[in-house]
């Protein structure tokens, strides 16, 4: 849209981390481009790229963080809440251990927002991420809540976020364990109503398993009897 020259290197078209070290790749790309966006699994990869590229490196998604998605989500919440960010409450429900749960917790803590997570304790962010969030909240005045009760997590909230329960690359067998843990954390009409806020809005970074119109959605329905997974 802005007229930049963009080159896309897909996994099959690059030897990064395989036949060529991250360091060497960073140095070469840094001489060819004005900026690099990395979207992949390892947080350590994007950090090493940033150390050696000599140009700005953007995290487009890793296993730990999804900052570009969070910037878009913040803009959306600002546009649709009618409140300053510091007065806006939002809740993440589901598996909170990975990039979306981590990023939503930390950005809310940084910006002084009312930030909640509703998840089984086994699926909370790591102790290190939680400690970082509390440290940021002490400076910003953010209100943080981590609870295993999804009803408590959404009470009075302005936005309810969720994400898929099984990430790319995880084996199919994981579905059984995740669904057993997370059945009570699906975003349903009842959970939206539990917010007690007629203006509450739903957010998802997508793609979402919300019906039977995909192969996975149909398999989930036949196997577990669920029409939709994390949201219905």
Curated annotation (Swiss-Prot):
Carbamoyl phosphate binds at residues 15, 39, 66-69, 204-207, 232. It is found in: Cytoplasm. It catalyses: carbamoyl phosphate + L-ornithine = L-citrulline + phosphate + H(+). Pathway: Amino-acid biosynthesis; L-arginine biosynthesis; L-arginine from L-ornithine and carbamoyl phosphate: step 1/3. One of its GO terms (cellular component) is cytoplasm. Changing residue 176 to Q: In strain: CCUG 4165A, CCUG 4557, NHITCC 2376 and NCTC 11050. GO terms for biological process: arginine biosynthetic process via ornithine; citrulline biosynthetic process; L-arginine biosynthetic process. The record marks 79 as: Important for structural integrity. Pfam families: OTCace, OTCace_N. Keywords: Amino-acid biosynthesis, Arginine biosynthesis, Cytoplasm, Transferase. Its EC number is 2.1.3.3. Changing residue 45 to I: In strain: NCTC 11050. Changing residue 14 to T: In strain: CCUG 4165A. The keyword Amino-acid biosynthesis applies. L-ornithine binds at residues 99, 163, 167-168. Changing residue 187 to F: In strain: NHITCC 2376. It is an enzyme of class 2 (transferase). It comes from the Bacteria. One of its GO terms (molecular function) is amino acid binding. Reversibly catalyzes the transfer of the carbamoyl group from carbamoyl phosphate (CP) to the N(epsilon) atom of ornithine (ORN) to produce L-citrulline. Belongs to the aspartate/ornithine carbamoyltransferase superfamily. OTCase family. NCBIfam families: orni_carb_tr. This is Ornithine carbamoyltransferase.
């Amino acid at each position: 849209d802005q007229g930049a020259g963009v080159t896309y290197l897909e996994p099959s078209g690059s030897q990064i981390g395989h036949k060529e070290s991250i360091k060497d790749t960073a140095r070469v790309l840094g001489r060819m481009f004005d900026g690099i966006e990395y979207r992949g699994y390892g947080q350590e990869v994007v950090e090493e790229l940033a150390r050696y590229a000599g140009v700005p490196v953007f995290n487009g998604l890793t296993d730990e963080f999804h900052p570009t998605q969070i910037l878009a989500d913040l803009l959306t919440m600002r546009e649709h809440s009618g409140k300053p960010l510091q007065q806006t409450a939002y809740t993440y429900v589901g598996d909170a251990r990975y990039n979306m749960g981590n990023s939503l917790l930390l950005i809310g803590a940084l910006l002084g927002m009312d930030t909640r997570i509703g998840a089984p304790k086994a699926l909370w962010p790591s102790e290190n991420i939680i400690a970082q969030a509390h440290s940021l909240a002490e400076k910003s005045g953010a209100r943080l809540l981590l609870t295993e009760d999804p009803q408590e997590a959404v009470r009075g909230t302005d936005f309810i976020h969720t994400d898929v329960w099984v990430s790319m690359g995880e084996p199919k067998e994981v579905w059984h364990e995740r669904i057993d843990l997370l059945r009570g954390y699906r975003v349903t009409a009842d959970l939206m109503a539990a917010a007690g806020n007629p203006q509450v809005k739903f957010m998802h970074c997508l793609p979402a398993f919300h019906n039977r119109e995909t192969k996975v959605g149909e398999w989930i329905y036949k196997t577990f009897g669920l029409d939709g997974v994390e949201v219905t």
